[in-house]
Amino acid sequence: MKIAIVGSGYVGLVSGACFSDMGIEVTCVDVNEEKIKSLRQHKVPIYEPGLQAMVERNCKASRLNFTTSLKEALDSGVEAVFSAVGTPPDEDGSADLSYVLGVAREIGQNINNYVCVVTKSTVPVGTATLVREAVQEELDKRGVNVEFDVASNPEFFKEGAAIADFMSPDRVVVGVDTPRARKLMERIYRPFTLSSDRMIFTDIRSAEMIKYAANAMLAT
């Protein structure tokens, strides 16, 4: 199985390393050329216990790759694209979705086969609808009909314990709205949930809300 993760910051890099450590072929995409150059040399720009060794191990095994080109990742035959780009606050405090929707548009401009577009970034409820519209708009511009799904898969790992949290999650929340997307996400997470049924499937809006609710509880 092949997947791509767009955004090689904290969430994207930890997710990519952990997925690859379980045998999935992962391509991490980032527009920052210097960051990608460093990662290709196994220089990890963040500190997280166990991450450096995990990146080195999976790069050497050719399961973890880095590129600045999302098109290159899509052309390699990935089945899912996880969006882990930033959502910085606007002046009014609302989430800036320009990076999230930029990824969606680029996917629509380049896909030729089915993919599931999975949002890992913390986003407002309803973002998946905007992502779907952005992908479809680009497909319409190209005059092509390519099937795709959208999904929400928020992360809950803690800094300093991210590897352990990801590899042995107490829950994996996934918001989907088609059986095909659900089956794909089950395949992706099967190695992480063999010991017990930790996957929680909801509709997409509920998954988006769960992340916001969890953040609000942690902030109190």
Residue ranges and their predicted role:
Residues G77-V78, Y114, P169:
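Local beta-strand N-terminus motif with an aromatic residue
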Residues S83-V85, S121, V176-D177:
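Glycine-rich, N-terminal phosphate-binding loop of Rossmann-like dinucleotide-binding domains
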Residues M1-K43:
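NAD(P)+-binding Rossmann beta1-loop-alpha1 motif at the extreme N-terminus of oxidoreductases
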Residues P88-F156:
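Rossmann-like NAD(P)(H) cofactor-binding subdomain of soluble oxidoreductases
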Residues E25, V31-A80, G86-A95, V135-K141:
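Conserved N-terminal Rossmann-fold NAD(P) cofactor-binding segment
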Residues V29, T67-S69, A151-N153, T202-I204:
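Conserved beta-strand termini and adjacent loop/short-helix elements that scaffold enzyme active sites
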